A protein has these predicted regions:
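Non-cytosolic beta-sheet module surface loops
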Residues: 43-45, 54-58, 111
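Non-catalytic extracellular/lumenal accessory regions of secreted precursors
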Residues: 17-47, 134-156, 164-166, 178
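A metal-dependent hydrolase metal-coordination microenvironment
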Residues: 140-286, 291-320
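Bacterial N-terminal signal peptides
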Residues: 4-14
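Surface-exposed beta-strand/loop patches in noncatalytic accessory domains
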Residues: 20-32, 56-92
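Noncatalytic modules at the cell exterior or secretory-pathway interfaces
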Residues: 48-51, 96-118
Length: 322
């Protein structure tokens, strides 16, 4: 990895603004080995915003992007093309706002697809002493909602919904709520990919839509299968192969927080169109459910549903209660 530091001062003409330090980090993508690797950088005291610009330098390769602070997770943008920005009170989608702690941070890079070899990456990390993002007063710490009330009855809902906090989706929670209410739903589970940044917007959305329940969750997205963590409000590491990170450990961690671990679209094998969508991992003991309808019968149809039902039926035949 090569590191270039560009400091801005009154005596130096450089591509950095006042109050910024630019770190240019580039290098080769490790060939083989684990699916994720890390590019560390140091953040000094007084930094209030960090921007990470990223490039996979290829029309054919696909790299995914995330960010860790000294304590761990700060966001996972996956295939988001825009830069990642984190600040004290605001962040770009998929990332978590909060204190910018001095110390060793790292860019997390996932090797989603590598065909143009040798592969390389390029990063520009911008450290600022003043924020550039507009305030996001709608962000707040997540607290469980009391529920809809109304007593025992059947409740209609959607257990696999992505908001704009996922790279493959655009709608804010208000638009999701409007569609859900138009279809007579009582709840929606917001299962964004490998992040829980959406939970910071739940309080405002729930207050605006008291008759629609927003259920926390996350889509545990790996390169060999996706699973839904229904009810999850604590992040669980998805980087399979890193120390202590296994499917069994992840499923157990979700179960420990009261979330249901459900395999999503288990037979959806579309290659590069949907990387890792078919389930190829082992089946964890804590598996609670299997998604058998993805996208609705009117769109995905029996092309997805029959194979998913067969997958579920086989597991039930092995003695599992799902």
């Amino acid at each position: 990895m090569r590191l270039t530091i560009v400091l801005c001062c009154s005596l130096l003409a450089a591509p950095a603004l006042a109050g910024e330090t630019k770190l240019v980090l580039d290098g080769p993508v490790p060939d083989g080995g684990l699916d994720h690797f890390f590019v560390p950088f140091d953040v000094p005291e007084g930094t209030v915003e960090i921007e990470v610009q990223h490039d996979d330098l290829s029309d054919d390769n696909i790299l995914d992007w995330g960010l860790d602070d000294p304590s761990g997770f700060r966001g996972w943008g996956g295939g988001n093309s825009e830069p990642a920005i984190v600040g004290l009170d605001a962040a770009s989608r998929s990332y978590v706002a909060g204190p910018i702690v001095a110390g060793s941070w790292r860019v997390v890079i996932g090797k989603a697809k590598l065909v143009d070899l040798p592969a390389s990456y390029a990063l520009t990390v911008i450290l600022r002493d003043a924020g550039t993002l507009a305030p996001q007063p709608e962000r707040a710490a997540y607290h469980p909602f009391a529920g809809l009330g109304g007593g025992p009855r059947w409740y209609a809902g959607d257990l696999h919904v992505h908001s704009r906090e996922s790279g493959d989706a655009k709608p804010p929670l208000a638009d999701i709520a409007a569609l859900a209410r138009s279809r007579g739903l009582d709840f929606v589970e917001i299962s964004d990919h490998n992040t829980l940044s959406q939970l910071e917007f739940f309080a405002a959305a729930q207050a605006a839509q008291p008759d629609l329940l927003f259920v926390p969750g996350s889509e545990f997205t790996t390169y060999a299968g996706h699973a839904n963590a229904i009810g999850a409000s604590v992040w669980v590491d998805h980087k399979i192969g890193q120390p202590g990170v296994t499917i069994a450990a992840a499923a157990a961690a979700y179960a420990a927080q009261g979330a249901l671990f459900s395999i999503n679209h288990p037979a959806l094998d579309l290659g590069d169109v949907c990387i890792g969508c078919a389930w190829k991992h082992e089946i964890p003991a804590e598996l609670a459910a299997v998604e058998v309808a993805t996208g609705g019968l009117d769109k995905a149809g029996k092309f997805l549903t029959d194979d998913a039902i067969a997958f579920w039926d086989q597991l039930c035949g092995e003695g599992r209660h799902l």
